[in-house]
Structure formats: structure tokens, C-alpha cells
From Swiss-Prot:
GO molecular function terms listed in the Swiss-Prot or TrEMBL record: acetate-CoA ligase activity; AMP binding; ATP binding; metal ion binding
Gene, per the UniProt record: acsA
Record-given protein name: Acetyl-coenzyme A synthetase
N6-acetyllysine: residues carrying this PTM: 610
Protein's organism: Vibrio vulnificus (strain CMCP6)
PANTHER family with a match to the protein in the record: ACETYL-COENZYME A SYNTHETASE (PTHR24095:SF243)
Upper lineage: Bacteria, Pseudomonadati, Pseudomonadota, Gammaproteobacteria, Vibrionales
Length: 650
């Protein structure tokens, strides 16, 4: 691969930072050699009702996996995100809402957020919600989504958010698994100029005979569209909040009380309910937000994720608000009504920190300068990437085109299961290499192991990425199935948390995520991460996006099957076919040359923008009779089109 360029820490960032390199090294050293002392001190980043005296009781031992942090302390999440800021910054903006339509926006100050959250907390109590009950949110990206989350935490209810794009079947499955008591939804959502039938989907989900626990559906009026109404079950948000008090004392919660359940699709079978608890999660969300984004008071932070994903939980709602930040909640999509929408929002709200996904970056990159037309983005100070490894070409484009070569990029690696960011640069401390997530955050001990579970001690190495010890934000269990938790994360490599990802570590100790371990190809005895070949393909000037899967090959073991999407205005030709193969040969070597090039207009993606490689593997091998769980697909029609194209390739 082409040698990565190194971007040193910028002097202006270093001058006003929470952690320069010396500070990072000292803090990191303490965090791994004396985690008790480190987290005893930094656990105080949040306000405790009853201070903790126990810091860490954790075990990764087979049959005894047990994770507890700060367990004798008590606190309340909503009080940390709202109440503690009221005296000093009650009139400061907490949430900026930017609607799908660029003309729609509004703000909520911390004082206003307090009132809204207290009201809705009391409304939930009126609907019979008690401490420990599960509340399911199926909401559009409106401020009320954050209000509902915070209200649940205020009264000690456990929220489970289902992304508003999921089908009624997927919603029903999550309601059944979580035993939710109440659903909070809207009449309709709005996304990319189209209405999303949220209430209709809830009605349909609740016709499933297995759904037995729902007593009420609270409906926020977003569009005023026509909906069916069930008199004894359905309640309007505005009516429920009109007649209640706007004072609601926060419930005192134990650190290990459940905070939320968030479902991730397992590659087989039913989705896993990832359970996070109150104290450790909030400490870790607060700490990572402060240091990773180097947040300074008064700055405007924009995480483009939906609240239905872990990124939306941790870095749109809880992390920013616990730090008293100003956070943007965006209803729309980055390219509607035009390609420069993301840049326009940055200018309109003078965004200082932007956190988005490689999928969005690549989609904008394919449109070239249209993505920044009529904007200057001069307010940006820090930019971030999340969701999957970002290929160096997209990193460079993001850095130069969106960020004007002024803003360091924090390429963050983490998972739903980890609660917060685990491997990341710190803006004032870390020299950057495009495509590398760089170094571990405080308290995180990554290691690379071979397939037998032996830790690879060499500095420069490649292997399976594991974490050797617990950190406060770690998930505690799979809801209702602790055995599945142990089986999934701790049985592959004994005594270690297995991330499911492969990585390489370079001579500077920087980590490069190579993709899911099941995305590792073995071609003629050579192990290759699919991410590396995809990066080489996307570096070609005519290619917008690529996905690589392995297919069985009689001689080589595996052959390389490449799905390739071209930039707007480019079309597949025999010349381009040869050119692309030669390009990969030059970038990586003959061993990485794709055996099959499958040109296509679109790849199957989850609604959070991840490419569903499992489906691509099945299509490539012709095994399309059972595609498994496809409920998370953004556009299921893409799959049929790919199957038809594959038939023509043969």
C-alpha cells in the first residue's frame, strides 16, 4: 500500500488542549498500571448522590464473567446531563434541532430541557411507568427523542431505542425480547423529504400475538398526518404533558442499575440486547467526549448519527450533555435537499466539532466539490469518523475538502458493546496517520492474538483484536441471556474480550483496524483484510465505493470477489475492467487482484450505513435461499438487483 502521510499535532490545538502527548502518556500509563486509582479519581467527572468506595470488580473468567464498576455509588443520569448545569449555564443552548427541511430549526436551553424532561417524566409516571420498567422508543430525530431518553433515566426506567427505519417485524421482536411496557413514537417521521409511517408501524408491530406487555403508546405529533387511533391504548404526547407538574425529582439509581438496552443484529438468530448500566457508562461517555473531541466550553458539537444507534446515545445525547455542551440533533440526511447540506449545516450553526461516518464521507466524495458548494466551513476545529474503518483516500478528502486542512480527524474505533470510544487519536496529543485509529483511550488495554489465543508481543504485528481488561463503559450482559454474552465475547479467547475485529499494529504502536475477522481472506495462504483491498479500489479516481468478499476457489482456497460502485458519470467498460485490476495489482500486489469485478449502482447497507458483507458473501457464492436477518437493511431492493446482476455475470 502507498506509504501513509503523517500529520503532526497542530500547534493551535496543542496550545489549548485537555491532553498533550506527555499528559496522554502519563494518564494512560496510570490507567493501565493502577486502574483502581485512576478511575477512583476520574469517576468523579460525574456527580454522585452517594459517592462510591468500590471502583472495579471485574472478571473475564470462563463461566464467571462479571463486570461491575463504582457499584456502591448512586447517581442519576438526567441530573448529570441537566440539573448540574442549571446554576451556571441554564440559559445556554443544550440542543440545536435542525429539521429535514433546511427552514425548520429550533433550540432548547438547559432550563427549557429541564422543564420538558420533568414534564415528560411525570407524564410517563401517569402512564404507569415505574423504576425498572422498560420503555421502547421508536422516534424520529426530533428534540423529543432526547427528552424521552432523559425522562426515562430521570425516573429510573430502562429505555430501548429502535431505529425509526426498522420494520414492524423488527420492532415487534425487540419489544418481545425486552418486555417493554410502553412505546413512545410519533405520527410520522420525516427523512430526506419523505414521510416515515412510524405510528402505522407500531400499530402493525402490536398486532403480533407474542407482544403481550405493552399497555400504552405515547404519540408525538410531528406531521399531523392521518393515523389510526386506539382509544384506550394511545395517548398524545402534548395532552399527556399538558396537565402534569414541571418538577420531577430525579430517582436515586445504583451504579449497576440498568440504563438502556440496545439491540445489535447478530449474524445469526435473534438480535442481541446489549445491556448498559448507569454509573460506568456515564463516566465513560463523559470522559471520552471531553478528551477525544477535546471539547472546550461554548463549542457546538454535531454528531450526525441517529439516536437509534449507540453513537447517538453516547455522543449525541449523554456525552455532550453531561459535559454541558451544545449538541446538534439533525432530522435529515447529509445530501438532502442537495449534496452540500452537511456543509451548509456546519456554516449555519457554526459547528466546531463534526462527527460523522465514512459512508457519508464517501457518498459526498463521489460528488466532488458539490459537497462544499457555497460554504466555507471555517468554524470547524475538530472532525471525527465513526462506524467502520475509514480508508486513507476518504480520510484525506474529508481532511482537505470538508476541513480545509485545518481540523485534525479523530478516527474512532468502538462498538455498541463498548459503550464508548476505545481506540482513537486525541487532538492535542496524537500525530495522525490516515486510516489508523492510532492509540488506546485511558484504561483500555488492546492486544493482538493469534488464532490460538497467544498474545503477539512484537510491536509490528497483525492478529485478532482483543481487550485484556474491563473499562467502565463495557456492556454488562446480553439482556436475559448471560450465557450468550459469555459465548459471544469471551469463549473464543479465554480471559479476554474478543472484539470480532482484526487489526495490525505498526512500528509506532498505532492500531489499524482491518475489518471483521470473518472479513479476512486467505488467498493462496496469504491473509488479507478486505479493508485493505477496498481501500486500494476506492483510491482509484473513478470508484466511489467497493466491498470485497471471498468466494471458494479450487486452487487458491479463496478468490477475491469485488463489488464496485463508480462515481457519478462513470460507466463500466472493458478498458476500465482491466485498468481497475491493474490498479489493485500496483497498489497492493498481484495476490490482491480481484478475480471478479461486479459493477453495481448500490451496495446493501444497514440503516446506520454499514455494508452488509454477510449478504454480499451469500450473493457472491450463489447461496441466496436464506439470507438471514435482513430487517436492518436500508433498501432491500438492492439485494434483488445484485442477485440479478450476479446471474448475468456467470
Amino acid at each position: 500500500m502507498s506509504e501513509a502521510h503523517i500529520y503532526p499535532v497542530k500547534e493551535n490545538i496543542k496550545a489549548h488542549t485537555h491532553a498533550d502527548n506527555d499528559t496522554y502518556l502519563a494518564m494512560y500509563q496510570q490507567s493501565v498500571t493502577d486502574p483502581e486509582r485512576f478511575w477512583s479519581e476520574h469517576g468523579k467527572i460525574v456527580d454522585w448522590i452517594k459517592p462510591f468506595t468500590k471502583v472495579k470488580q471485574t472478571s473475564f473468567d470462563t463461566g464467571h464473567v462479571d463486570i461491575r464498576w463504582f457499584e456502591d455509588g448512586t447517581l442519576n443520569v438526567s441530573a448529570n446531563c441537566i440539573d448540574r448545569h442549571l446554576a451556571e449555564r441554564g440559559d445556554d443552548v443544550a440542543i440545536i434541532w435542525e429539521g429535514d427541511n433546511p427552514e425548520d430549526d429550533k433550540t432548547l436551553t438547559y432550563n427549557e430541557l429541564y422543564t420538558e424532561v420533568c414534564r415528560f417524566s411525570n407524564a410517563l409516571k401517569e402512564q404507569g411507568v415505574r423504576k425498572g420498567d422498560v420503555v421502547c422508543l421508536y422516534m424520529p430525530m426530533v428534540p423529543e427523542a432526547a427528552v424521552a431518553m432523559l425522562a426515562c433515566t430521570r425516573i429510573g426506567a430502562v429505555h430501548t431505542i429502535v431505529f425509526g427505519g426498522f420494520s414492524p417485524e423488527a420492532l415487534a421482536g425487540r419489544i418481545i425480547d425486552s418486555d417493554a411496557k410502553v412505546v413512545i413514537t410519533a405520527d410520522e417521521g420525516v427523512r430526506g423529504g419523505r414521510a416515515v409511517p412510524l405510528k402505522k408501524n407500531v400499530d402493525e408491530a402490536l398486532t403480533n400475538p407474542e407482544v403481550k406487555t405493552i399497555s400504552k403508546v405515547v404519540v408525538f405529533k410531528r406531521t399531523g398526518g392521518n393515523i389510526d387511533w386506539h382509544e384506550h391504548r394511545d395517548v398524545w404526547w402534548h395532552e399527556a404533558t399538558a396537565k402534569v407538574s414541571d418538577v420531577c425529582p430525579p430517582e436515586e439509581m445504583k451504579a449497576e442499575d440498568p440504563l438502556f438496552i440496545l439491540y445489535t443484529s447478530g449474524s445469526t438468530g435473534k438480535p442481541k440486547g446489549v445491556l448498559h448500566t448507569t454509573g460506568g457508562y456515564l463516566v465513560y461517555a463523559t470522559m471520552t467526549f471531553k478528551y477525544v473531541f477535546d471539547y472546550q466550553p461554548g463549542e457546538t458539537f454535531w454528531c450526525t448519527a441517529d439516536v437509534g444507534w449507540i453513537t447517538g446515545h453516547t455522543y449525541l445525547v449523554y456525552g455532550p450533555l453531561a459535559n454541558g455542551a451544545k449538541t446538534i440533533l439533525f432530522e435529515g440526511v447529509p445530501n438532502y435537499p442537495n449534496t452540500s447540506r452537511m456543509s451548509e449545516v456546519v456554516d449555519k450553526h457554526q459547528v466546531n466539532i463534526l462527527y460523522t461516518a465514512p459512508t457519508a464521507i464517501r457518498a459526498l466524495m463521489a460528488k466532488g466539490n458539490e459537497a462544499i458548494e457555497g460554504t466555507d466551513r471555517s468554524s470547524l476545529r475538530i472532525m471525527g469518523s465513526v462506524g467502520e474503518p475509514i480508508n486513507p483516500e476518504a480520510w484525506e478528502w474529508y481532511y482537505k475538502t470538508i476541513g480545509n486542512e485545518k481540523s485534525p480527524i479523530v478516527d474512532t474505533w468502538w462498538q455498541t458493546e463498548t459503550g464508548g470510544i476505545l481506540i482513537t487519536p486525541l487532538p492535542g496529543a496524537t500525530a495522525l496517520k490516515p486510516g489508523s485509529a492510532t492509540r488506546p483511550f485511558f484504561g483500555v488495554q488492546p492486544a493482538l492474538v493469534d488464532n490460538m489465543g497467544n498474545v503477539i508481543e512484537d510491536q509490528a504485528a497483525e492478529g485478532n483484536l482483543v481487550i485484556l481488561d474491563s473499562w467502565p463503559g463495557q456492556m454488562r450482559t446480553v439482556y436475559g441471556d448471560h450465557e450468550r454474552f459469555e459465548q459471544t465475547y469471551f469463549s473464543t479467547f479465554k480471559g479476554m474480550y474478543f472484539t470480532g475485529d482484526g487489526a495490525r499494529r505498526d512500528e509506532d504502536g498505532y492500531y489499524w483496524i482491518t475489518g471483521r475477522v470473518d472479513d479476512v481472506l486467505n488467498v493462496s495462504g496469504h491473509r488479507m483484510g478486505t479493508a485493505e483491498i477496498e481501500s486500494a479500489l476506492v483510491a482509484h479516481p473513478k470508484i466511489a465505493e467497493a466491498a470485497i468478499v471471498g468466494i471458494p476457489h479450487d486452487i487458491k482456497g479463496q478468490a477475491i470477489y469485488a463489488y464496485v460502485t463508480l462515481n457519478a458519470g462513470e460507466y463500466p467498460t472493458a478498458e476500465l475492467h482491466k485498468e481497475v485490476k491493474d490498479w489493485v495489482r500496483k497498489e497492493i500486489g498481484p495476490i490482491a487482484t480481484p478475480d471478479v469485478l461486479h459493477w453495481t449502482d448500490a451496495l446493501p447497507k444497514t440503516r446506520s450505513g454499514k455494508i452488509m458483507r454477510r449478504i454480499l458473501r451469500k450473493i457472491a457464492t450463489g447461496d441466496t435461499s436464506n439470507l438471514g436477518d435482513t430487517s436492518t437493511l436500508a433498501d432491500p431492493s438492492v439485494v434483488d438487483k445484485l442477485i440479478a446482476e450476479k446471474a448475468e455475470l456467470v
